[in-house]
Amino acid sequence: GMRNILVISLVFLLSMVCHAQKIATSELNGTKWKEISPTYDYCERGMTFTMDTRTTSTKFYKTGKEFNCPLKYYISSSIPETFDSSQIGKSRKGSYIIQYVDNSVFWFKIVDISSTKITLLSKLGDTTVYQKVK
């Protein structure tokens, strides 16, 4: 009956949320994103990708100053134990953006991606939504 349909659709929705989306390095290459959730009153945040670098940017409204933080990355289908620098710049497909921060593996899970938006869940447990700029 109706209840079964609700349960099934709920299970389907939950599985959609839990299953990460796959992306290729070549698809991220050359893209630019603006953070839309969370938002900040005092700054605008964003990120850009090349084949081997993910650069996060913070632009402060008051001063107009922009700070960029470029970090090497690679795409992986799982979270690695150690950072494999030989994978940087290679076109791979997977659900995780892998970076090396403070001598350890830092990761973002690609929870959702469309032609206009990307949702990332970080190792620290926070979720960030970006809108595509180009």
Residue spans for each PLM region:
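Hydrophilic extracytoplasmic domains
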Residues: S26, D112, T116-K117, T127
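Tryptophan-anchored aromatic micro-motifs
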Residues: T25-C43
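Broad, structure-driven detector of short, well-ordered beta-strand segments within folded domains
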Residues: R45-M51
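Short, low-complexity, Pro/Ser/Thr/Gly-rich segments in the mature regions of secreted, periplasmic
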Residues: G125-V133
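Bacterial Sec-dependent N-terminal signal peptides
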Residues: G1-T25
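Contiguous, well-ordered beta-strand patches that form the walls/edges
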Residues: P38-C43, T58-T116
